[in-house]
Regions:
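Conserved glycine-rich FAD pyrophosphate-binding loop
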Residues: 74, 81, 90-95, 101, ...
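General beta-strand structural signal in soluble alpha/beta enzymes
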Residues: 20-24, 55-56, 76-80, 98-100, ...
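Short cationic amphipathic helices and targeting signals
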Residues: 51-56, 114, 222-227, 271-289, ...
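Short, conserved charged micro-motifs
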Residues: 61-64, 124, 232-237, 284-291, ...
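A conserved active-site cap/scaffold subdomain adjacent to cofactor or substrate pockets
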Residues: 228-230, 243, 247-250, 258-303
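N-terminal flexible segment immediately upstream of the FAD-binding catalytic core
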Residues: 1-67, 83-112, 259-267, 307-331, ...
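FAD-binding subdomain of flavoenzyme oxidoreductases
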Residues: 105-107, 122-123, 127-246
């Protein structure tokens, strides 16, 4: 969708020399993310595109663009690296894509804390902080390409969540600076619990221009593959390792057969028909970790030392939603779900779902910390047939007590929230009174407007 009646030349004159992209091929590319993982979203979002892309390099330039967009009532969709999976950065109403990738500085690093610009890539932040003994607490499998602003705006957790929980947990985001889209745009600072007003809001509640993020101790992480002959043994190994508080770990990713067969680069380490655990464990914990592997009947088939972490394959790039990416590279009919199972050391519900669905819903678990307990989240691979069948699978999971964060919707509240966040809606009314920021994504705003 574009805005044919707007005088774009006048708009461009109002923002001066800030970089603008008008080439249609580039604009269409920068209007998309990985929405096509979903056969439901693919037809809904395929034709959505911005009118142009603007790339500011500073907060001052963001203010200039904000002023121009408010004056012309132009929709604004904020973009980091476009690595989201359900249309978070796809413009539904045309307008401007505000690409913040040029705002990529690390302003300062202190013990346990860093101040960064939104376009800073996660791996680039670690490159600055790790020599000082610190690292970002968690990151998605798109670690090398994703930006911190995009992760905060559209993500929820990832590698590191087994220790630190999810992004919205108190303490995982310290402060943000935000530019508003009022008649006179201003800069406001949110600290402490106030940050939840923009955390995981798809950029609907202001333009983040700076973030203070807590850091964790930087450990030497070994990457390990452990294989099992039985899936439930692999899943129990994941639970026991997660519950072993004295063992320091960053990633516990469990994959039922045939998922490991989709990992082309890892095939030398994955025997045919095996079930696999892809892991990151601190090197000081390896001795007792190996004893646990032996107790549970696993076989270590691959190990990469922390000293080689930057070389070659990263195991993290086969976990979380990279699992879906690799699987779809071999079978594009596959899609996925996002499910949170209740804490249960016996994993009875997981076993039931594994046996009930068989290969139609292939079990992929990612362990994370929630309310001081280690729980299995799942990004199951689904053999898609019809939208009705997909909905029936979701309904069955929910009826049996699992929580499904539906990845087949671009509406904020219809995915992982399930309820309208009235505080976020009230905040949007203050900072974006015309509803210009990523319009169409927040149900609470749409219902308020009607």
């Amino acid at each position: 969708m574009t805005i044919p009646t707007l005088n774009w030349d006048a708009f461009l004159a109002s923002i001066g020399n800030i970089e603008v992209i008008r080439d249609r091929t580039q604009v269409e590319k920068l209007s998309k993310d990985y929405y096509y993982f979903s056969p439901i979203l693919q037809p809904q979002l395929a034709d959505k595109t911005a009118d142009l892309v603007v790339r500011p390099t500073s907060e001052t330039e963001v203010l200039t663009v904000a002023q121009a967009c408010v004056a012309a009532k132009v929709p604004v969709t904020i973009r980091g690296a476009g690595t989201g999976n359900y249309g978070q950065c796809i413009p539904l109403a045309g307008g401007v894509i505000l690409d913040l990738s040029r705002m990529n500085g690390v302003k300062w690093v202190r013990p346990g804390m860093a101040c960064v610009e939104p376009g800073a890539k996660l791996a680039a932040i670690d490159k600055v902080t790790r020599p000082q003994g610190w690292e970002i607490r968690m990151y998605p499998s798109t670690y090398r390409t994703a930006t911190i602003g995009g992760f905060i705006g559209g993500g929820s957790g990832g590698v590191g969540s087994i220790t630190y929980g999810q992004l919205r947990d108190r303490g995982n985001l310290q402060a943000v600076r935000v530019v508003t889209l009022e008649d006179e745009p201003r800069i406001i600072e949110l600290r402490g619990d106030e940050v939840q007003q923009v955390n995981h809001a798809y950029g609907t509640n202001g333009i983040i221009t700076e973030l203070e993020i807590p850091l964790g101790p930087a450990y030497p992480w070994a990457e390990v593959i452990v294989t099992f002959d039985d899936f439930m043994t692999a899943a129990r190994f994941g639970q026991v390792l997660s519950d072993s508080d004295g063992l320091i770990k960053k990633l516990i990713s469990i994959h039922a057969a045939p998922i490991p067969s989709y990992f082309a680069a890892l095939q030398p380490y994955l025997p045919e028909g095996c079930h696999a655990a892809l892991l990151m464990v601190a090197e000081p914990s390896l001795e007792l970790f190996e004893a646990l592997v032996q107790e549970l009947g696993g076989t270590i088939t691959y190990r990469k030392a922390a000293a080689d972490a930057g070389k070659g394959t990263m195991l993290a790039e086969f976990t979380w939603n990279h699992t879906t990416l690799h699987a779809r590279n071999m079978d594009s009919s596959l899609t996925y779900l996002q499910t949170l199972f209740p804490y249960d050391p016996e994993l009875k519900l997981i076993q039931h779902m594994y046996e009930h669905f068989g290969d139609e819903v292939m079990m992929h678990l990612e362990y994370l910390r929630m309310n001081s307990m280690a729980v299995p989240a799942a990004l199951q691979l689904v053999r898609f047939t019809t939208a009705e069948r997909l909905q029936a699978i979701i309904r069955y999971l929910e009826e049996k007590g699992a929580f499904v964060a539906n990845p087949h919707t671009y509406i904020l509240e219809d995915g992982g929230r399930k309820v309208i966040d009235t505080a976020q809606v009230a905040f949007k009314a203050k900072v974006d009174p015309y509803g210009l920021l990523n319009p169409g994504k927040m149900r609470g705003w749409l219902e308020r407007s009607t």
